[in-house]
Curated annotation (Swiss-Prot):
UniProt keyword Ribosomal protein, yes or no: yes
Membership in a protein family: Belongs to the bacterial ribosomal protein bL28 family.
Stored Pfam families: Ribosomal_L28 (PF00830)
Name assigned to this protein: Large ribosomal subunit protein bL28
Single Gene Ontology MF annotation: structural constituent of ribosome
GO biological process, one term: translation
Superkingdom assignment: Bacteria
NCBIfam families (alphabetical): L28
Keyword line: Ribonucleoprotein, Ribosomal protein
Species classification: Bacteria, Pseudomonadati, Pseudomonadota, Alphaproteobacteria, Hyphomicrobiales
Signal peptide positions (record): none
SUPFAM superfamilies according to UniProt: L28p-like
Gene Ontology annotations for the cellular component aspect, listed alphabetically: cytosolic large ribosomal subunit
Organism, scientific name: Brucella anthropi (strain ATCC 49188 / DSM 6882 / CCUG 24695 / JCM 21032 / LMG 3331 / NBRC 15819 / NCTC 12168 / Alc 37) (Ochrobactrum anthropi)
Length: 99
């Protein structure tokens, strides 16, 4: 399992610890990842995703998983999230035709 957010693509970054004496040692900055279950209102199902705390805030801010995925760029999403986005778009298109 990679240390990357499935919705925003945030992943491990590398840098230095810098001491008071200005000694530098390499370190990793890990993203704050959480295993969460998010509900898709369009599909009527819940999905387990590994997302960063920042992405979770963004999902709530945009009004849910469906709205977040529709507005997000494909290159940031994981393969699972892209598949989910396509399913949501297909279901919304079917609902628009039926209405």
């Amino acid at each position: 399992m990679s240390r990357a957010c499935e919705l925003t693509g945030k992943s491990v970054q590398y840098g230095n610890n810098v001491s008071h004496a200005n000694n530098k040692t390499r370190r990793r900055f890990l993203p704050n990842l959480c295993n969460v279950t998010l509900m898709s209102e369009t599909l009527g199902q819940s999905y387990r995703l590994r997302v960063s705390a920042n992405a979770l805030r963004s999902v709530e801010h945009r009004g849910g998983l469906d709205a977040f995925l529709v507005k997000s760029d494909d290159k940031e999403l994981s393969q699972r999230a892209r598949l989910l986005k396509r399913q949501i778009a297909k279901k919304q298109a079917e609902a628009a035709v039926a209405a």
